[in-house]
Amino acid sequence: TLPAIDGGDDLITPLNVLVGGQASPTDSGSQNEGQDTDAPKAAAGVQVKSADLEGDWPTRAEDALRRHYSRQERAVMSALGAKADGWWDQPRWDRELAEDLYRLASACVDEMGREACTRLGFNPDEDWDLPRTQAYLQAVTKARARWVNEATRRQIEAVLAEAGTEGVPTVFDRARSQRAAAGAAAFIAAMGSFATVEASKQAAPGQGTKTWITGRNPRPTHLAMNGETTPAWTDFSTGLSWPGDPAMGPDESAGCNCTVSVEITH
């Protein structure tokens, strides 16, 4: 399923309720097409690993985050230098980063989804449909943008309290040198996992399985899932649909570099 997201301008609590319109992102997309929810019979098939589809997307994502942090630093330092009370513009930063991440997500999910279809033996021109993912990607990237910016704001507030304005550039130096790479790797791992699972669901509804592959320094809950296999349209034992799934909030998804493999059974 395409799970509800904790965050984003269109979302309110509880996590699976949207403001008006559809009840949740699960109301649209390939998960609502009458899939056979019985576990597919085991059969030999081609496995596709999401990590194999990432290409240079982590580098592109890191570049986008670095640019965001630099743009943010210029604006924040200018406002602090002018002794302005409103030195932090959360709506602006959330909007700008969400737009950057959505453009990135749309491009990488389309490329990886098409490639996953091809590797699974299907024709992406017939069996892959990016528009079916776009509403969900918009919700995901809004949530991710807010999480990133809230972390930056908290770090700036802590530095201002301890060292004053002079310490603020260190927040952005660390963001560019450390957070950008880690955040980019986690974001692309999540998008790759989503694209791979979604490709299997679109191309062969009710016929795919997915397997959790633990990454580096995993959470204990994620380590416990290493090798866990489930039908592609159901959740893993933790309630996550794939690595990086933000449905359960940043505590279960932020920084996650686990991946997934999918297989079509016949």
Predicted feature residues:
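Pocket-edge structural micro-motifs
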Residues: 1, 214, 262
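Short amphipathic
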Residues: 209-215
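N-terminal leader/targeting and assembly helices and adjacent pre-domain segments
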Residues: 20-208, 232-235, 263-266
